[in-house]
């Protein structure tokens, strides 16, 4: 199965959470981007992706479909947030892609359309 959509808008969310019964210094913060657009593949229900950013090497999960297959969730290291924001804010078209193979392999990415080389 393949998911491919053109990014038309995005929103940044910075959140903080303190679970019931936790100590005040156990609050956790998160950063995510919600990307929305239009599918490039006929019949694909996925037109949104949530990029979740994780601080440090631990805690990374593989890409997955959520919300009954309508949302692609991709995890990236927090260090990539500035590069991804720059990519989204630059002129040109950006795409989100997800590929789910029968052997269990999952590939997901955010990429830009080819840019002509300067002469």
Task: Describe each region flagged by the PLM.
Residues 1-55:
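OB-fold ssDNA-binding interfaces and closely related basic DNA-contact patches used
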Residues 1-14, 64-69, 113-119:
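Surface-exposed beta-loop interaction hotspot
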Residues 19, 40-42, 58, 103-105, ...:
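Generic "edge-of-domain/loop-turn" microfeature
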Residues 25-35, 60-64, 104-112:
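Short, well-ordered strand-loop elements centered on a beta-strand within folded domains, enriched
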Residues 51-74:
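Extended, solvent-exposed segments with strong compositional bias
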Residues 71-118:
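Short, compact, well-ordered microdomains
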């Amino acid at each position: 199965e393949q998911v491919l959509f053109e990014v038309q808008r995005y929103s940044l969310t910075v959140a903080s959470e303190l679970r019931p019964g936790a100590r005040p210094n156990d609050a956790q913060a998160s950063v995510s981007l919600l990307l929305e657009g239009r599918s490039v593949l006929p019949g694909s229900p996925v037109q949104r992706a949530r990029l979740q950013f994780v601080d440090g090497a631990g805690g990374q999960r593989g890409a997955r479909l959520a919300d009954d297959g309508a949302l692609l969730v991709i995890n990236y290291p927090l260090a990539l947030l500035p590069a991804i924001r720059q990519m989204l804010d630059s002129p040109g078209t950006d795409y989100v892609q997800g590929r789910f193979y029968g052997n269990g392999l999952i590939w997901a990415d955010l990429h830009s359309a080819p840019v002509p080389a300067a002469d």
